[in-house]
């Protein structure tokens, strides 16, 4: 079956694994997925990313992060711009997620960045997802 939205698939797998408190989740790898997971790693939402090849498709193994009392670090994760309805923002309209408690991942001309960096660098682009 052809996947129409691989980014939504990544976010859904992470959301579902996080909901049942799995330690790791595996997703097929792509450059955009690697960039999104690297942002999640830098922002402290996940523990580790490992890329491996199972012979057919390169995969990403994402280690999820939990707090001291096993509480979830990722409270919510939401796809914003979808293949059927793209969502863009200008440099002056970069969204804030929960007044700065979460991050928006934005695809800009400089690559994927979080909302803070887009505001600082004066960049707009496609709003891929919110994580909080």
UniProtKB/Swiss-Prot annotation:
GO terms for cellular component: ribonucleoprotein complex; ribosome. PROSITE patterns: RIBOSOMAL_S8 (PS00053). GO terms for biological process: translation. SUPFAM superfamilies: Ribosomal protein S8. Keywords: Ribonucleoprotein, Ribosomal protein, RNA-binding, rRNA-binding. GO terms for molecular function: rRNA binding; structural constituent of ribosome. Signal peptide: none annotated. The keyword Metal-binding does not apply. InterPro entries: Ribosomal_uS8 (IPR000630), Ribosomal_uS8_CS (IPR047863), Ribosomal_uS8_sf (IPR035987). One of the primary rRNA binding proteins, it binds directly to 16S rRNA central domain where it helps coordinate assembly of the platform of the 30S subunit. Belongs to the universal ribosomal protein uS8 family. Part of the 30S ribosomal subunit. Contacts proteins S5 and S12. This is Small ribosomal subunit protein uS8. It comes from Clostridium botulinum (strain Eklund 17B / Type B). The lineage of its organism: Bacteria, Bacillati, Bacillota, Clostridia, Eubacteriales. The gene is rpsH.
């Amino acid at each position: 079956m052809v996947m129409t939205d691989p980014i939504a698939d990544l976010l859904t797998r992470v959301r579902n694994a996080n909901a049942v408190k799995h330690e790791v989740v595996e997703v097929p790898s792509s450059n955009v997925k690697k960039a999104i997971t690297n942002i999640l790693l830098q922002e402290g939402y996940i523990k580790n990313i490992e890329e491996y090849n199972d012979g057919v498709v390169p995969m990403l193994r994402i280690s999820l992060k939990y707090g001291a009392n096993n509480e979830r670090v990722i409270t919510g994760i939401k796809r914003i711009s979808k293949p059927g309805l793209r969502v863009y923002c200008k440099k002056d309209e970069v969204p804030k997620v929960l007044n700065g408690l979460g991050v928006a991942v934005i695809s800009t001309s400089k690559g994927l960045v979080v909302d803070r960096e887009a505001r600082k660098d004066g960049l707009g682009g496609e709003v891929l997802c919110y994580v909080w």
